[in-house]
């Protein structure tokens, strides 16, 4: 019986998988090529580095990703523990201090006696033993080529982007105001109000701004959930008003009126010295970011701590390659996890690592691998990425659309979602008990 598992990749999925393996007594060899070899998006050597936003989205049980988080908490997720421990104010959402978050994950794993960390690049898929490949959408070229060959299909890709971060001390507090939309949760966001004239001047400059060159980039290959603000703007002058610049529920306390448009800033670290511009993922040249984003009221003298940037993300054709336990169909003992499987988002990525980690541990212990109930967020994601049409396969966030409908009617959408979440948690509890999952 093999009681050793190799995990390749120390991102969110690989870190969660390593934790799930280690807590079940498995000896884990965790390989991470950083800092010896870096990627276009990473900036540190820490595990579970957040390269895009610091938000893990909704924390509400009436939201699919909120349900996913709760399921993961029920299964003793390291990523959720670290996120809850390093949370910063974000209204009804869960946002974290990104540096503290990755530091907690890194220290936890490195302190475990049965997790052996190797700072080196893996260039081939191991043929023997049990392995989890969780190298993420920025997998090194050499290993990516091996994975492509193993899958027997062309790898798919999309382009992802990160939003700029500004120094809190450079924000004009005479203009911005603190408020969460509809006053949900604590007043966690700084809001930059725009008049109609200010909005259209900003819009005109944004669509005319110069973008950086990126090989192979096309607007159609942008993931909808992380679309660059300039791409969104080019879809129509009012598109942003129904997206990140939506003003509803954000009345300006100085005037008592709703602005024409509002740009929100979200706290990026626990010390509240940095804020990111919500929804402003971008591929503009750095000079253009400074010029155009300084037109936002309150950011006229903004100091940019980090400019937005874009990178290419690669993922595999999971419907042709994986079973819903995240194990490869043509090689027993080889699992894939994380964004490269086609789940999209920090929490979703970690969730896939959780399931892959549990299953790799069970295989190492000579137990049957598990297929989580389709009525749970974890099970519905695994089911989607392995059964959907390969021809039209695209990355997917957690969604109620993936979960079975209720067998009774609930008219109110929020209440209906809550009922689906309650059913999911009940089914997960029964599944845990039946399969003796701790």
UniProtKB/Swiss-Prot annotation:
Its cofactor is FAD. HAMAP family: TrmFO. NCBIfam families: gid_trmFO, PRK05335.1. Keywords: Cytoplasm, FAD, Flavoprotein, Methyltransferase, NAD, NADP, Transferase, tRNA processing. It catalyses: uridine(54) in tRNA + (6R)-5,10-methylene-5,6,7,8-tetrahydrofolate + NADH + H(+) = 5-methyluridine(54) in tRNA + (6S)-5,6,7,8-tetrahydrofolate + NAD(+); uridine(54) in tRNA + (6R)-5,10-methylene-5,6,7,8-tetrahydrofolate + NADPH + H(+) = 5-methyluridine(54) in tRNA + (6S)-5,6,7,8-tetrahydrofolate + NADP(+). Catalyzes the folate-dependent formation of 5-methyl-uridine at position 54 (M-5-U54) in all tRNAs. It is found in: Cytoplasm. Its main location: cytoplasm. FAD binds at residues 9-14. Belongs to the MnmG family. TrmFO subfamily. It is an enzyme of class 2 (transferase). GO terms for cellular component: cytosol. The keyword Translocase does not apply. It holds the Pfam family GIDA. This is Methylenetetrahydrofolate--tRNA-(uracil-5-)-methyltransferase TrmFO. Its EC number is 2.1.1.74. One of its GO terms (biological process) is tRNA wobble uridine modification. One of its GO terms (molecular function) is tRNA (uracil(54)-C5)-methyltransferase activity, 5,10-methylenetetrahydrofolate-dependent. SUPFAM superfamilies: FAD/NAD(P)-binding domain (SSF51905).
